[in-house]
């Protein structure tokens, strides 16, 4: 089991947005991975993007450029 660390977790309204995020990140070489939404977060769909906190600015720019709507950005232990 992985050691829990403080991460940036991007929650989405829809699964389609989560999948679009994964595709955009892979195309742009942005780190991160899809995870089940942590229990501490309530989100519209069951998937979230997990990435290091240091990537917040890059993630926000990618969301804007790709036209992906995030429900919220959270900092939580994952």
Model-identified regions with their sequence ranges:
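Short, flexible, solvent-exposed loop/turn segments with mixed acidic/basic and small polar residues
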Residues: 1-2, 35-40
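Short glycine-/aliphatic-rich beta-strand segments at the starts of folded cytosolic domains
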Residues: 4-11
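C-terminal structural segments of small proteins and small subunits
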Residues: 50-78
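A generic "binding-loop/recognition-motif" signal
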Residues: 15, 37, 55
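Short amphipathic alpha-helix segments
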Residues: 13-31
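A short acidic, helix-capping loop that chelates divalent metal ions and anchors anionic groups
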Residues: 41-45
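A short linear hydrophobic-aromatic micro-motif
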Residues: 31-37, 71-72
């Amino acid at each position: 089991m992985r050691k829990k660390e403080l991460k940036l977790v991007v929650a989405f309204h829809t699964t389609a947005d989560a999948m679009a995020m994964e595709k955009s990140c892979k195309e742009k070489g942005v780190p991160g991975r899809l995870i089940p939404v942590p229990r501490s977060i309530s989100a519209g769909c069951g998937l979230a993007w997990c990435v290091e906190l240091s990537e917040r600015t890059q993630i926000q720019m990618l969301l804007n450029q790709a036209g992906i709507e995030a429900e919220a950005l959270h900092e939580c232990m994952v």
